[in-house]
Amino acid sequence: MSDYGLLIDMDGVIYRGNEVIPGAREFINALVDNKIPFLFLTNNSQRTRLDIATKIQRMGMRVTRDHIYTCAISTAHFLARQGKDVTAFVLGEGGLMSALNRNDIAIVDKDPDYVVVGEGRSYTFEMLEQATNLIINGAKLVATNMDPNCPTANGGTRPGCGSIVRLLEEATGRKAFDLGKPSPLMMRDARKLIGLEAAHTFMIGDTMETDILGGLQLGYHCILVLSGGTRRTDIDNYAYKPDTIIDSLADLNIEILEQLMAKKPHHHPALPSC
């Protein structure tokens, strides 16, 4: 097995909507063939790992659900570490509910330890009102992610999980704890899940604010792809920079990954004394 591995965003990196991005199929299958460990990371809490893996398989990539790590799973793992008999009131759908159930988090309507917010299309004002009062009365607010919006299948945009969380923050005066990208908890747990050291980890994504920021904060080698939401001219607007920039996964292969890893320092230089 390789001594390095990858964390890979999906939308804008391997596909756009239901269309595979050129080069992605060949790159992902090469990782599988060469037994290079990798996980797909997503801030989509609606869909289960099986749902996501099935979509990717239909695009010709030989992956399984074990290659998928969602913000819903990150959230469920965090809650499970908080002790026994943890309870949650949930604003969310199938993927989030499944992850919580698999980690023995009891879903309740009264006196929860946490209010957990994920994406959803079935919110009602009454549900938001109930969540507001539960938080005011002591439940802790947890966000599966803070993405402000989400793309729709017809090319439009709808409010994302972060928009709902902001509403609850404003209504209650409480701040949410975010467990999606770029949360270090999610991105560190994903790395550990496939047995990688930080210095041997690539993060590939198309979004500066989540994929690249989160990876840089943990010392990963960050590769920005320009096949999604970021243009080359956008990069100068940020105080931080990716380690590598490519147009798409068509510009990346195993040989290039090994060259990049060979050039990456495996320790940070000592800081000058003040």
Where are these regions (language model features)?
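Asp-based, Mg2+/Mn2+-dependent phosphohydrolase catalytic module
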Residues: 1-10, 15-34, 45-69, 76, ...
